[in-house]
């Protein structure tokens, strides 16, 4: 848990419960990561780059569909899900706020995870280290510090910071993916 001006037991409990609920919602999309990794690895070895593109785009499509549906459950069911784990009104209220923000970035999480699987499948896993360092350390520290301490948004700054870091990570990684795939002679996001 990132140090914020609000490190009360309420915020820690809320985040602990909410992150587990978020992970449950993300579970259906996890299988697509492994599918993309397997398909990419096989087709990369067989030098069938068009099939890599096709598999990647299909996994992205279904990942987005799954997570848009999951986001709707997360956003509108946040209160119900929090009440399953606690009766404390303060914890529920804080958790609802986080889950509703998490619902805004949940649809893009499979994009990052499936893209990471794609890069691993084409034997370029080093880029996943860079994006993970940005997402979990450098970008998170800078953005969350700015929001929580400099702009004084406190706990709300942490939640919004997580949203911003996730979106930036996906945007940066999609540029990396597109660039690296072009170096292999494969244009993932080509125009028709």
Predicted segments with their positions:
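Helix-terminus/linker motif at the lipid-water interface of multi-pass membrane proteins
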Residues: 1-18, 24, 42, 80-89, ...
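Membrane-helix interface segments
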Residues: 8-11, 125-126, 154-155
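Small-residue-rich hydrophobic transmembrane alpha-helices
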Residues: 14-78, 109-131
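Alpha-helical membrane-interface segments at transmembrane helix boundaries
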Residues: 16, 22, 92-100, 135
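Short runs within selected transmembrane alpha-helices of multi-pass transporters and secretion channels
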Residues: 29-37, 102-121, 127-139, 143, ...
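Short alpha-helical transmembrane segments in multi-pass integral membrane proteins
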Residues: 40-105, 148-192
């Amino acid at each position: 848990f990132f140090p914020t001006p609000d490190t009360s037991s309420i915020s820690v409990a809320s985040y602990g419960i909410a992150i587990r609920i978020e992970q449950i919602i993300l579970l259906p999309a996890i299988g697509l990561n492994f599918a993309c990794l397997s398909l990419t690895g096989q087709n990369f070895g067989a030098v069938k780059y068009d099939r890599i593109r096709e598999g990647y785009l299909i996994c992205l499509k279904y990942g987005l569909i799954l997570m848009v549906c999951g986001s709707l459950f997360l956003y509108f069911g946040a209160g119900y899900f929090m009440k399953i784990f606690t009766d404390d009104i303060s914890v529920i209220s804080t958790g609802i706020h986080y889950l509703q923000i998490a619902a805004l970035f949940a649809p893009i999480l499979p994009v990052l995870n499936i893209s990471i699987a794609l890069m691993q499948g084409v034997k370029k896993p080093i880029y996943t280290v860079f994006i993970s360092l940005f997402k979990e350390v450098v970008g998170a520290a800078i953005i969350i510090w700015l929001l929580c301490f400099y702009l004084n948004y406190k706990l709300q700054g942490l939640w919004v910071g997580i949203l911003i870091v996730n979106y930036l990570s996906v945007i940066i990684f999609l540029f990396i993916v597109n660039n690296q795939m072009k170096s292999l002679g494969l244009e993932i996001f080509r125009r028709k």
